[in-house]
Amino acid sequence: MPKWAALFMVGAAWLSAADPAGMVLIPGGEYFRGRAFPWSDYEVAWYPNPVKDDSPARKITVDAFWLDAAEVTNLRYAAFVKSEGHRAPYHWRSGQMSAGKGSHPANNVSWDDAVAFCAWDGAKRLPTEAEWEKAARGDQEGKMYPWGDRDITAKDAVFNQIDGPQAVCSKGKVGGLCDVTGNVWEWCSDWYGQKYYASAAPVNPSGPETGQYRVLRGGSWFDVPPLFLTIPYRSWARPGERSPTIGLRCAKSAAR
């Protein structure tokens, strides 16, 4: 096959047609990042003094990239632990994942653990916060959820649970992606900045240069109020935090 035949056009960029296994191509382009809808009485009742760090909503541009279709599973993470001798999540007894949990998302994973896994898994990386929101929004500009503004239900996402996460992709896909909302929070590469949106670069923003916390997006199985599960909601944790509600999903820059 001639070299040109292995290329295709997405936006203004020529990209390799080789599809990384288990990943979805997120087209590059502009979108409005941040909260573009008002706070409801229900949300204020749950969260009376919101930080409102998801504003102002601004138009930004990101390049095309690949994103894992699903959150990293215990099975994938176990292969990494075995291959690299990396520490296992602390809840794995004797360093072994629980039986029957291979298809569940890996959790109790720190930011550094997540970075190391993604590098091992085909020279990937964590998505930037801007990339994560671009993927989560799809064509739902200014909406609350990946499917629009309809209220979230148990058919849409894994949330309001007490027994931990569920198998990935058990709630279906939106735009080829599973569990963008709920199941486990997902680490992003950025440092967290409460007022960062007002000064962020308009093209490929990658977060503040320094900070104490790394960004988390998407909500988890434990979260009750829909507030934490909306697309623009931002959370954070110290890089060394290992929590039952935190997992990961990897990204990869699209070859030009």
Model segments located where?
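Short, compositionally biased
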Residues: 2-87, 111-112, 138, 238, ...
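Functional-site microenvironments in short loops/helix caps that host divalent-cation chemistry
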Residues: 25-26, 32, 37-49, 87-235, ...
